[in-house]
C-alpha cells in the first residue's frame, strides 16, 4: 500500500503543475524569411517562395515574360496581387514541373495564392472569395478500350 500512495502523490503533483500548452504549428517560413507553398493543377506541380521585395517573378530560373509566351498567362498569374492590391511588393521564385503551359500557369497561380495567404491572414477572405485558394481538381478523363477517345465511340449501325 505505501507504494500506491507514492505513485498517487506523484500524479497529483503533476496535475497541479502548469497545464501543457500546445504549440501552434509554424507557417512554412524558411530561414531567409520566405513563405513557401505548393500549387497543383492537372499534372503540374509548382513550388513557390514568396518574400517581400520589388515585384520580380522568376519561374525555373527565367523571368516570367521569358517563360510564358503569352501576356494573358502573365496577367492571370498576377491576379492574386491585383485582388490583394500588393503589386510590386513581393518577389517570387518558383519551380514548376510536369504538365503543359496551361497547367503550369494554374499551378503557379495556386501556389502564389497559398503563399500570400500565409504571409498575411487578412488576405484569406479576399483570395477565398476570388476562388484562388481552391485547387482545380479537373484532370483529363482516361481513354476507354473499345472507344476512340474518352467519350468518342465508333459509329453505331443497327443493321
UniProtKB/Swiss-Prot annotation:
The gene is rpsI. GO terms for molecular function: RNA binding; structural constituent of ribosome. InterPro entries: Ribosomal_Su5_D2-typ_SF (IPR020568), Ribosomal_uS9 (IPR000754), Ribosomal_uS9_bac/plastid (IPR023035), Ribosomal_uS9_CS (IPR020574), Ribsml_uS5_D2-typ_fold_subgr (IPR014721). This is Small ribosomal subunit protein uS9. Keywords: Ribonucleoprotein, Ribosomal protein. GO terms for biological process: translation. It comes from the Bacteria. GO terms for cellular component: cytosolic small ribosomal subunit. It holds the Pfam family Ribosomal_S9. Belongs to the universal ribosomal protein uS9 family. It comes from Rickettsia peacockii (strain Rustic). The keyword Ribosomal protein applies.
Amino acid at each position: 500500500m505505501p507504494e500506491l500512495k507514492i505513485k498517487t502523490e506523484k500524479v497529483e503533483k503533476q496535475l497541479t503543475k502548469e497545464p501543457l500548452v500546445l504549440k501552434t504549428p509554424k507557417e512554412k517560413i524558411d530561414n531567409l524569411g520566405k513563405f513557401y507553398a505548393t500549387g497543383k493543377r492537372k499534372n503540374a506541380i509548382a513550388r513557390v517562395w514568396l518574400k517581400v521585395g520589388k515585384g520580380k517573378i522568376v519561374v525555373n530560373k527565367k523571368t516570367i515574360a521569358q517563360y510564358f509566351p503569352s501576356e494573358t498567362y502573365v496577367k492571370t498569374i498576377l491576379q492574386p496581387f491585383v485582388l490583394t492590391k500588393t503589386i510590386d511588393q513581393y518577389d517570387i521564385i518558383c519551380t514548376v514541373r510536369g504538365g503543359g503551359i496551361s497547367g503550369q500557369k494554374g499551378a503557379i497561380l495556386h501556389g502564389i495564392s497559398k503563399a500570400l495567404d500565409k504571409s498575411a491572414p487578412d488576405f484569406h477572405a479576399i483570395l477565398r472569395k476570388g476562388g484562388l485558394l481552391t485547387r482545380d481538381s479537373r484532370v483529363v478523363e482516361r481513354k476507354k478500350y473499345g472507344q476512340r477517345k474518352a467519350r468518342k465511340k465508333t459509329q453505331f449501325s443497327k443493321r
